[in-house]
């Protein structure tokens, strides 16, 4: 029983680490291009996009852990690693697509349309590569995947909410739109970077 609690504790600790201190967007820049495209896009729900990305990252983590451990002894495992993890993302995406088609809920059409955009994302593949290059255990990988997904959800919500406020007339016209969004993301990234204990040299 204590081993199970210890494993859950490790997974939770890594989830919190990935959510706040190692946020995929603000500390590593993973998925920023997709995040910027989401701001102001009325066709794609930011909430559902981030939720699908979170589920995808959580499901890919154990699959990539087991698949990655199978190629360790191969001579070119470093070159095969990204392809293998991309295949893991594809398998999870196909699985999620099949589930969404089988359920046929009121939002199934929307979720099926958003799924490829959310699953095939540098945030998902980058998180898996971080997990495997750092040699995380299974519990650490699952926790980090969940935390990274929740961190992406947090970042999407922060930037989407800011997008509504960044349309102010007080902002000079040259900075409206993409420039002010990038400045806002940069300031948030510096705040997270400072939160992790790094000093910012200006």
Question: Could you tell me what each predicted segment is?
Answer:
Residues 164-183:
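Interfacial loop-to-transmembrane junctions
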Residues 10-26, 77-91, 142-155:
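Structural signature of hydrophobic alpha-helical transmembrane segments
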Residues 153-169:
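Transmembrane alpha-helical segments of integral membrane proteins
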Residues 52-61, 113-129, 177-189:
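Small-residue-rich segments of transmembrane alpha-helices in multi-pass membrane proteins
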Residues 6, 190-202:
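Juxtamembrane boundary at the C-terminal end of a transmembrane helix
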